[in-house]
Amino acid sequence: MKIRVGLIGGGNISDTHARAVKGIPGAEVVAHYGTNAEKVNHLSREHGGVAYRDLEPFLAHRSMEMVILGSPSGAHAQQGIAAARQGLHVLTEKPIDISTERADALIAECERAGVKLGVTFQDRFKPDIRRLKQLIGEGLIGKPLLVDARVKWYRPPAYYSDSRWRGTKALDGGGALINQGVHTVDLLLWVLGDVINVKARTAAMLHKIEVEDTALALLEFASGALGLLQATTAAYPGYPRRVEITGTEGTIILEQDRIIAINLRNPYEGPVSTVETDQNPSSTSPVVSDVRGHQSAIEDFIHAIEHNTQPICDGREGRRSVALVEAIYRASTKT
């Protein structure tokens, strides 16, 4: 089955999506939509497909089966709903949108229209992260007790000042937590389960933006485990994401995309990591050089379309991270 894809958005992430689609047999980018003529025309020249500057004629492009949203986060639900009403399957970049209210509206419309909805959390497809979930699920470290998750990244001032939407409440929904930290929020929920209690503080410590560039949250999981989450874009020069999970029988440490340590009460004889290098230097740059994670997420979504199954991260799964981010933001306003 030939899957023809339309891309919404003219930025770096839409280029990532286009490169990822090119690597999938039977998939083709046939149309691009963006409000910046220079950017969307560049994507069209670089990757093929018709360029549109208006959403309505883009969605009417007759040879599409699905769209991938790479637009500002706060536009996802509105654009996704419009696509679903045209019978198009919708795969959106993270987060699904900037509020659970908008997420719910998008989920409901896709269900009403009978189209698939997915959210791109590419970490779920990376080998060591999948293995982390498997090992913890199998009880390798016993009952999880403590989690320390650190997203201490750096973005220069131009990252915000050169964009009309980054670091804004209206279109980014927040700052370092909902944009950069949301991948790790999703990872924690996927691996360890629901969070039932939150205490938090957020602040703009370095950047002159209306939302936070730093967030700290204390999490209580339904399992009884306790966690500390840090997310910042103010930690020069930027450090790899690090997640340490300690259980009754030992500790597993993930650094960026790789397991770097498995320390157990009883000697562990298996491999520590199954990969040699991280896929992308996210700690210092938003540009995705290695598209394997995105390609796997898009392939999974196409498989769901072709076989009428659910993608690994469907709309309801994607909503979970936004719900926890909202809870952290609410907790940060309490004294």
Region roles according to the model:
Residues 108-116, 130-146, 246-247, 251:
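Basic phosphate/pyrophosphate-binding loop/patch that engages nucleotide-derived ligands
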